[in-house]
Amino acid sequence: MSEQLVFRAIADPTRRSIMAMLSGGERSLNDITAQYEMTRPAVTKHLKILEQGGLIRVRAQGRQRLHALQPGALKTVSDWVSFFDQFWDEKLANLKQTVEMDDD
């Protein structure tokens, strides 16, 4: 899975909303479409982008295709955010040290 595909997938608020819905468990296309004021093909396009990003998986159950969050797929995003957490933690620690030295 490409990092670019993951970030592209989560860039859209509708896709983030679909992911939040899927955090409650598997849903069919009909269940997902019923929650949005958009056409079935539009929802299908969003789901395809999420699947390409590795954020959801699809499985067949009879005639239905059930969509579910893919465990661990957000690790790419988490790792990216963690890098910047460490960066800012270091910058803030340096600022604190500078301020404390100025107080002396």
Where are these regions (language model features)?
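N-terminal helix-turn-helix DNA-binding core of bacterial DNA-binding proteins
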Residues: 2-41, 65-79
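A cross-family signal for key residues in well-ordered alpha-helices
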Residues: 8, 20, 51, 57, ...
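Acidic-residue sensor for enzyme active/binding pockets
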Residues: 26, 51, 100
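Short, hydrophobic-biased segments on the C-terminal half of alpha helices
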Residues: 47-48
